[in-house]
Amino acid sequence: MVTVVENTDPKIKPVPAVIKELEEKYAGKFVVQHTVDDIPTVWVARADLLDVLLFLRKLPKPYVMLFDLSAIDERLRQHRQGLPDSDFTVFYHLMSLERNSDVRIKVALSEEDLNVPSATQIWPNANWYEREVWDMFGIVFTGHPHLTRILLPKYWEGHPLRKEYHARATEFTPYFLNTAKQQYEQENLRFVPEEWGMKRSGRDEDFMFLNIGPNHPSAHGAFRLVLQLDGEEVVDCIPDIGYHHRGAEKMAERQTWHSFIPYTDRIDYLGGVMNELPYIMSVEKLAGITIPPRAETIRVMMSEFFRITNNLLFVGTFIQDAGGMTPVFYMFTDRQKAYDVIEAVTGYRMHPAWFRIGGTAHDLPRGWQRLVREFLDWMPKRLDEYVKAALQNSVLKGRTQGVAQYNTKQALAWGVTGAGLRATGLDFDLRKARPYMGYENYDFEVPVGYNGDAYDRCMVKVEEMRQSLRIIRQCMDNMPQGPYKADHPLAVPPPKDRTLNDIETLINHFISVSWGPVMPAGECTTIVEATKGLNSYYITSDKATMSYRTRIRTPTFAHLQQMPSVINGSLVSDAIMYLASIDIVMADCDR
């Protein structure tokens, strides 16, 4: 076996158990790559790929979840010393909850032969991920049941995440829309059942095809759902995504490490600084930055505030989709109280872009404790009222209990995380399982449900808010003293008070805030327990002022893909409650 060292570490670390297991089975057939994030990473030959993936899926403590699957265009990458020759790389990020560990499998491909076998027979959620890779890179997955575009229209030309594809609007011919082009684009939106393997009629009846969206209040965003109906029963359904796609991963390749922060806020546009956290942490790991305890605590406190604002909106719209109009207005009032605190601390409400590489944009303002304490005194009583007045309502329970139900095994197979997974009885919360940002120092519980239905998913979200309130109170009571930003040359922006010392400090400050810092070459993934599930940023640095490749893994993408397996055979009304219960934001799905 050849071992590749990409990022040297002075400390000798034990060989991960999964590497030993692979060595016993495939000695000499794979290459180990060391990464900053310490996730075991191995390169395998394309011919061995499915065998290796199946082996990992069937280990005694198996890697049951395909957490992520994507690709990297390696053709312009300069700093990849020792790695196997590759024009394009397809990677598989696998997760084992029993081991509480991950493994990353990579396959090298040449530009002349962009083919790799499909993994849909091993993990059903590979379907959408492989379609996305084809859409963005043009890599073909042989054996895929329906390899078509997923984020872009089917008439789109080119594959945007290839390096030769332009990244700026000024590099394209100016866009225009005349009547003929509009009609062409509209015609391409026509749903043709045969293209999806659907029949227009059954043995004794004709099916009806119903479009919900892309502009529909129950779609929770620009999203189209096509239902194949036999009366009120859903025979099959096709979630049609991509209407909110903005090319966030492509944008990351043309923004400095610092200037990409505002874009992260707009992935899950309800998550605020929670979106910034995995990106910032990945960059900090690459740079070797250790942030001060005060910055850690501030980050945790503000992240939990956004968890509360997200969950309040979720619960309100959940009840609204079931027919209860009143609670959502009360919950908007409560969200306003939370946003008053957020705005006082960060200067903005929903998209503060406030975390910085190395810490936060500034320190907490004077009087922040009073604002936080007032919110903590207000919110618990309100949650009690919502549970008593709305969530224990017999009509709501009748609409949601036993509806859109799935078990833990199904959730893991489809890559479901967050409240959707915990509602099946599995108490997996990354803040407990793999503490980050000092979460191991906080006293809080992991709410779980046991029925895996729409009602349990909602109640888990309610209990999450109670735990967030506990965490925020501990942050307030135990806020450390000290700096709010690391004293590190790659922290951005550098301290302003040092810029006037001499010409060198002034030049360094100018370069940092204009061109941006140069981050060390390497790869790093950071996963956080975000508002809707597990969110990760996998960053590849080529020792430049901008990211070479930024992969954004979002929970909504995985959760929507599961929909047909849950809803087929149910009623149209159940499909609406399923969408209401999985907490989707289409910007989070489409990126």
From Swiss-Prot:
EC supergroup of this enzyme: translocase
A GO molecular function held by the record: quinone binding
Transmembrane segments: none
Region feature NADH dehydrogenase I subunit C, mapped onto this chain: 1-182
Alphabetically ordered keywords of this record: Cell inner membrane, Cell membrane, Membrane, Multifunctional enzyme, NAD, Quinone, Translocase, Transport, Ubiquinone
Keyword Transport: yes
Pfam families attached to this UniProt entry: Complex1_30kDa (PF00329), Complex1_49kDa (PF00346)
Reaction(s) this enzyme catalyzes, per UniProt: a quinone + NADH + 5 H(+)(in) = a quinol + NAD(+) + 4 H(+)(out)
UniProt keyword Transport present: yes
Region NADH dehydrogenase I subunit D, residue ranges: 206-591
One GO CC annotation: plasma membrane
EC number: 7.1.1.-
InterPro entries to which the protein is assigned, alphabetical: NADH_DH_suC, NADH_DH_suCD, NADH_Q_OxRdtase_suD, NADH_quin_OxRdtase_su_C/D-like, NADH_UbQ_OxRdtase_30kDa_su, NADH_UbQ_OxRdtase_49kDa_CS, NDH1_su_D/H, NiFe-Hase_large
Subcellular location: Cell inner membrane
Membrane topology note: Peripheral membrane protein
Record family assignment: In the N-terminal section; belongs to the complex I 30 kDa subunit family.
Function description: NDH-1 shuttles electrons from NADH, via FMN and iron-sulfur (Fe-S) centers, to quinones in the respiratory chain. The immediate electron acceptor for the enzyme in this species is believed to be ubiquinone. Couples the redox reaction to proton translocation (for every two electrons transferred, four hydrogen ions are translocated across the cytoplasmic membrane), and thus conserves the redox energy in a proton gradient.
Quaternary data: NDH-1 is composed of 13 different subunits. Subunits NuoB, CD, E, F, and G constitute the peripheral sector of the complex.
Name of the protein: NADH-quinone oxidoreductase subunit C/D
